[in-house]
Amino acid sequence: MKGFIDDANYSVGLLDEGTNLGNVIDNYVYEHTLTGKNAFFVGDLGKIVKKHSQWQTVVAQIKPFYTVKCNSTPAVLEILAALGTGFACSSKNEMALVQELGVSPENIIFTSPCKQVSQIKYAAKVGVNIMTCDNEIELKKIARNHPNAKVLLHIATEDNIGGEDGNMKFGTTLKNCRHLLECAKELDVQIIGVKFHVSSACKEYQVYVHALSDARCVFDMAGEFGFTMNMLDIGGGFTGTEIQLEEVNHVISPLLDIYFPEGSGIQIISEPGSYYVSSAFTLAVNIIAKKVVENDKFSSGVEKNGSDEPAFVYYMNDGVYGSFASKLSEDLNTIPEVHKKYKEDEPLFTSSLWGPSCDELDQIVESCLLPELNVGDWLIFDNMGADSFHEPSAFNDFQRPAIYFMMSFSDWYEMQDAGITSDAMMKNFFFAPSCIQLSQEDSFSTEA
């Protein structure tokens, strides 16, 4: 199967019941080892279909607008468009990308908090009217360049975790909302609703209680100025687990019934990103170099094997200047699986994993316990579908990993039963039975 990079058509291997993700990875590890190719992704599109089904079951009252910057792989966007999601776009390129798939402007929101004038004009030109705003300067830019804009006031929430104030960078205070409503009235900018965002790192779901209460206050304020409010955007913040989705729904559902009841004419939307794609993609990387170091050279507080055995530093053919770019702004807590088979009683050694750049920032895993690996061995990282597909840096001649798409026959039939057909709604897809055949000896390895 051809690896997708920017192909016009996406080849998707259909897997029978006897073939699983591990078999697919084994197949491409073998191929890439023979050809000396780079790291690669395997994308299970069936998981995206399942996530959408889960969303419709748990939070059917909330329409998802997928956050495009999370994973803008065209195949992902096309299958989500076929499923009927909206799209939250942060740039001109993202708006153009989803409109090329036939997505109507009414199903696109321009969510960038800091918009270039040229991009506001582009949104006006292509009919993308709904956008977010949290300050007076942005309101004035919108007023001058998009006469048909419909604005969601972005309000701040109280989800600062561990001293991190990332969410306070964007979003106005409740106190400042009246001033912004006054400005919008003077500028003749149409305010149609409110947006807030609660970080996925937030475990205090009481934050949603405060945010929804504040949103209701803004709706009431806006009514005083004569604005017709008809949309509430509760942002992203969904990790992808069914438990978290149910927990959030348990908190917000009764509040939505109170503050924004059904029949009130208010559409409830959200901007899930990693929820849809994180678990759908697996990354395979190759060990290209290794060093043996003394165990006590590792910094204090990191995982050690508690012995006098040596520790190992491994360098991989992908790093923060490629698929692990999000590691620069957030902690990556995942520990990879070792692809090769090893004995259960094989000793484990303190290990550190680095990208290929030799940059001190290019550390992927500070410390973990792994069996001794050799140059040419492969490591498997799960849940790599979010924030992993940006343009790679030209540093060290990095190349974007190939993507191999798959879907089980059962997921494919489920998709057909839902009325999503490749000939009518997913015209760029080519579905074909996979021909992967592996011996028992080549089967997927156990976890490290």
Curated annotation (Swiss-Prot):
GO terms for biological process: negative regulation of protein catabolic process; polyamine biosynthetic process; polyamine metabolic process; positive regulation of polyamine transmembrane transport. Its main location: nucleus. Disulfide bonds: none annotated. PROSITE patterns: ODR_DC_2_2. It is found in: Nucleus. The record marks K69 as: Not modified. Gene3D superfamilies: Alanine racemase, Lyase, Ornithine Decarboxylase, Chain A, domain 1. GO terms for cellular component: nucleus. It holds the Pfam family Orn_DAP_Arg_deC. Ubiquitinated, leading to its proteasomal degradation; a process that is reduced in presence of antizyme OAZ1. Belongs to the Orn/Lys/Arg decarboxylase class-II family. ODC antizyme inhibitor subfamily. Monomer. Interacts with OAZ1 and OAZ3; this interaction disrupts the interaction between the antizyme and ODC1. Antizyme inhibitor (AZI) protein that positively regulates ornithine decarboxylase (ODC) activity and polyamine uptake. AZI is an enzymatically inactive ODC homolog that counteracts the negative effect of ODC antizymes (AZs) OAZ1, OAZ2 and OAZ3 on ODC activity by competing with ODC for antizyme-binding. Inhibits antizyme-dependent ODC degradation and releases ODC monomers from their inactive complex with antizymes, leading to formation of the catalytically active ODC homodimer and restoring polyamine production. This is Antizyme inhibitor 1. It comes from Mus musculus (Mouse).
